[in-house]
Amino acid sequence: MILHLRFVCSLKFLFPFFLLFGAMACRTTETERNVFRENPKKNLGTDSKYELEDGLYAVHYGNGRRLELSDESEDGTERKETVFLFYLIKSGNRILLIDSGISSVRTKDRYGLKDWASPSTILEKAGIRGSMVTDIVLTHFSADHAGGLDLFPRARVFINPNDWELLKKTDWFPNLRKILHTKEKDKKLTFVQGSLEVFPDFRILFTGGRTPGHSAVEWLRFPKNRVLFAGDECIFTELCAGGKDPAGLPLYSVKNHREFIQYLELLVEQGTKILTFHDPSLLRPEEEVFPRIYRIP
């Protein structure tokens, strides 16, 4: 959820919305050009008890409160369960996370997460140590998305500069400012403004609805298999696909958010799979390959 936006909503500057269709290409090495090319014929599950195979996975690190949904066309109010997720892409020696979860017990307690497990504990059971994570895309600065960054010291971080500055003002985990400074000093930080193709067919999109620097990620896994990681611009996939979103959640820019939802609707019509970070319907028991780790077909 958007866990820390009271002071964001009071900001007086307006961050301009970049057109989602205007991607700015990033030069990459030849090694990077093939790093996220999946083989659609390969079984992306795992036959090993101790090792996660190449593929896309949702990591479920906690449960949240019921989110109240209101619809003016209906009587009464509906409440939907929420979960807390981040995503992992494994391709050979490259392990990329989209968001990082929450590492701090104090932060977890502050925001009332239930059935919480540290992201590092979950990943280690699948044979992934924190030092093995090579890249992290942060969709925005909120605790449940950026609050586990300290667990992955070697990872290069991709984030919008506005949300990086907001992240510096938080206390999501111990020694936060020192850790962020180390990322800057070690040049393990890439700022993303507008749209940026980080790897071939894998681009970060500025959305700017929930927070000033909110981003989404669009990835063409292979022909006819495109996914969109929506961050917190969309909470429940089915609602957003129909042009709706839970009322009452804080927004930095209503205009930007609505434009993104319209774009999302278009992608759904074209067959794109929408992945959100709080929708329990994305977790299928038969796809749980390790405890709390779910394969995304």
Where are these regions (language model features)?
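Active-site HxH/HxHxD metal-binding segment of metal-dependent hydrolases
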Residues: 95, 102-187, 236, 295
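N-terminal secretory signal peptides that target proteins for export/translocation
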Residues: 1-9
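Divalent metal-coordination and catalytic microenvironments
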Residues: 89, 99, 133, 140, ...
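C-terminal motif of bacterial Sec signal peptides marking the signal peptidase cleavage site
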Residues: 24-25
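Basic, amphipathic N-terminal segments that precede the first structured/catalytic domain
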Residues: 32-78, 196, 217, 290-292
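Conserved beta-strand hairpin/beta-sheet module of binuclear metal-dependent hydrolase folds
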Residues: 63-121, 216-233
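Metallo-beta-lactamase
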Residues: 39-47, 103, 117-128, 132, 161-206, 212-288, ...
